[in-house]
Regions:
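Membrane-embedded alpha-helical bundles of polytopic integral membrane proteins
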Residues: 2-256
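Hydrophobic alpha-helical transmembrane segments of integral membrane proteins
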Residues: 17-18, 284, 301-302
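Juxtamembrane interface at the ends
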Residues: 201-202, 206-207, 272, 276-280
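Interfacial loop-to-transmembrane junctions
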Residues: 277-299
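Hydrophobic alpha-helical transmembrane segments of membrane transport and translocation systems
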Residues: 301, 305-310
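Juxtamembrane boundary at the C-terminal end of a transmembrane helix
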Residues: 309-317
């Protein structure tokens, strides 16, 4: 550990001691609390990404992108939101025809794209192509991917096939509470797997690292460290299955661990590439001792879509 890293250790530990319990509490609570947490992290990560793009001469439409990103995040709570909106208007005697979740998401992305292109007609800064591309990329890569994390939590209980896991074919209050807990435990286990993967990759690389993984992008990362991270991610998900995720089969836990071990480290490399291209070490200094939100959650961005798709279309189908 370098002297600067050692000096920042108390701040890092202090921030982690506050942030980790809050994240766990929001994950277990689900609903609006978890949405608010993810939307906040998503918005700040997107802001940092746009700042990186600006350092390379782009002029992304920050306000448009951040607002669109929030609505994209909101789209992943649409089933819950749809019920609230429909009931609100029904109480006033108004019966609305509602979008499906996919229709709403596509509508939001279509309007967002049209607004970005129209705004560039009136701007005189930079390249319209580069400005539009960076604005759209940020929302698709960050907001959309974070949205799938929200959707993963929303599967419990809204997308949970009770008939598949309970012999009665329906869930009583105790079983519904169990399903809710599974949702929170799934998110917490995913985060734990990512953090343990990162930690194991770092210390494994320091102790045993000899062969560079991707020197042009991240000179300190090694194949040996990546292997330690990969194995640790799988073992963490297997342990989570034994302790709290009883609905997972053995191979499900292994596959989810594989997603973390592969796509989590890939996400870290991709963010490192963006930062190196922009000539900075951290995406920001918003989190004392940790850098920026994009720095801390870069792995989560790329893992979340694969976890959501697998749980929704394989585990719960």
């Amino acid at each position: 550990m370098t002297s600067s890293a050692f000096q920042s250790l108390p701040r890092r530990v202090g921030v982690a001691a506050i942030a980790i319990p809050l994240i766990i509490a929001a994950a277990m609570a689900g609903g609006h609390w978890f949405f608010a947490l993810v939307a906040l992290i998503s918005g700040l990560s997107l802001y940092e990404f746009y700042n990186l793009a600006e350092r390379r001469g782009a002029f992304p439409q920050k306000s448009v992108g951040i607002v669109a990103g929030f609505i994209v995040n909101l789209a992943f709570t649409y089933e819950r939101l749809q019920v609230d909106v429909y009931n609100y208007f029904s109480d006033m005697g108004i019966h609305l025809a509602m979008f499906s979740q996919m229709q709403f998401l596509l509508f939001v992305l279509l309007i967002f794209l049209m607004v970005v292109l129209m705004v560039e007609l009136f701007r005189t800064k930079g390249s319209p192509t580069v400005n539009s591309a960076t604005t759209v990329l940020g929302v698709l890569m960050i907001s959309l991917f974070y949205g799938t994390l929200i959707s993963t939590r929303e599967l419990f209980p809204y997308g949970f096939p009770v008939f598949k896991f309970f012999e009665t074919g329906f869930a009583d209050d105790v079983q519904m509470a169990m399903i809710e807990r599974w949702g929170g435990y799934t998110i917490v286990s995913l985060l734990a797997s990512i953090w343990i993967c990162d930690t194991a990759a770092y210390f494994g690389g320091v102790r045993f690292g000899k062969h560079k993984l991707f020197e042009r992008v991240s000179p300190n990362k090694t194949w040996e460290g990546a292997a330690f991270g990969f194995v640790s991610a799988v073992l963490t998900m297997l342990l989570a299955r034994i302790l709290v995720l009883e609905y997972l089969r053995l191979h499900d836990a292994i596959i989810l661990g594989l997603f973390v071990g592969v796509f989590g480290q890939m996400g870290d490399l991709i963010e490192s590439r963006f930062k190196r291209d922009s000539g900075v070490k951290d995406s920001s200094d918003l989190i004392p001792g940790h850098g920026g939100f994009y720095d801390r959650f870069d792995s989560l961005v790329f893992v979340s879509p694969f976890v959501y798709l697998y749980i929704d279309f394989v585990v719960l189908s």
